[in-house]
């Protein structure tokens, strides 16, 4: 993870990334107090603020609960997955981008691309999510579901050029 973060922030980040079994962004709340019962509410709150400062989580402060509501970001998987799964989501996203450049029709359905990659959903989703910002918004299939970051893409030439640049910049 990031060495400049406190030891508690690193443990919290790893815990949350491990808890996201399907590789999708997760939601956490006061259960973190139970999961880290040896820590104070203040120390956990400070560690969460560190994670938020690095863009690894977003925090929503609400009345009542002891801790803010926590939502992990894709950057958390990028930071933690090499240690958790042994796979780097950035390197994996380059593999997926190359598959999409070679066969753009694979982008239509995330499930089809996942099958061709041959990866577990836990490995696939963070890598796939890293490609979403490089596809024009109107060509991204976004129905509400809990399987993938998006259901797929309808790739146009501009998107393929963006993916080629992504591969160039991340290889």
Segments (PLM) and residue ranges:
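Winged-helix-like regulatory helical subdomains adjacent to P-loop NTPase cores
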Residues: 1-16, 73
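Short amphipathic alpha-helical elements of helix-turn-helix/winged-helix folds
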Residues: 11-19, 95-103, 127, 134
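Short acidic, hydrophobic short linear motifs in intrinsically disordered regions
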Residues: 22-36, 105-116
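Short amphipathic alpha-helical interaction segments
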Residues: 38-54, 118-133
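A short, conserved structural fragment
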Residues: 52-63, 132-147
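Minor-groove-contacting beta-hairpin "wing" of winged helix-turn-helix DNA-binding domains
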Residues: 64-72, 143-155
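Short, amphipathic alpha-helical interaction segments positioned at domain boundaries
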Residues: 74-99, 153-171
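Leucine-rich, amphipathic alpha-helical/linker segments
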Residues: 89-117
């Amino acid at each position: 993870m990031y060495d400049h973060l406190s030891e508690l922030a690193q443990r919290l980040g790893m815990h949350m990334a491990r808890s996201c079994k399907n590789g999708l962004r997760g939601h956490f709340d006061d259960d973190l107090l139970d999961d880290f019962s040896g820590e104070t509410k203040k120390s956990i709150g400070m560690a969460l603020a560190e994670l938020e400062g690095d863009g690894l989580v977003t925090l929503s402060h609400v009345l009542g609960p002891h801790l803010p509501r926590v939502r992990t970001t894709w950057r958390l998987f990028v930071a933690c997955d090499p240690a958790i799964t042994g796979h780097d989501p950035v390197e994996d996203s380059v593999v997926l981008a190359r598959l999409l450049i070679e066969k753009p029709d694979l982008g239509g359905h995330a499930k089809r691309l996942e099958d061709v990659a041959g990866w577990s959903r836990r490995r696939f989703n963070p890598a796939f999510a890293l490609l979403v910002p490089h596809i024009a918004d109107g060509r991204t299939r976004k129905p509400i579901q809990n399987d993938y970051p998006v259901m797929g893409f309808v790739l146009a030439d501009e998107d393929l050029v963006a993916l080629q640049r992504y591969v160039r910049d991340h290889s």
